Amino acid sequence: MKQLLVIIKPFQATAVLDLVAQHEVEACFVDEVKGYGRQKNNLEQYRGSEYNLAFLPKVEITIWAEDEIAEKLAKEIAQVAHTGLMGDGKIFMTDAAWPEAMEF
């Protein structure tokens, strides 16, 4: 089992989630987050507002999937979300056991 933590630009979320829906994953969660990568301390226009790149809005998608599916999905997400511009995003893949959860 692998956990994918995908950080992308908000406008790419629909395309990435459509791709995730085509694969058998154990779970998928989506959050709106802010943060920075290597581009910190630069100003950029985003939807008519100026942002310090240290805290641009992003979408975080957390996915749990079997190893083979996760590897394939990570490559496909990278292709779909890539624009070639700074701040496209990151994909972190870690080994994970399915956590014990209390369902209610």
Task: Tell where the protein language model's regions lie, with residue ranges.
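Positively charged, small/polar-rich N-terminal and surface patches that mediate targeting and assembly
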Residues: 1-104
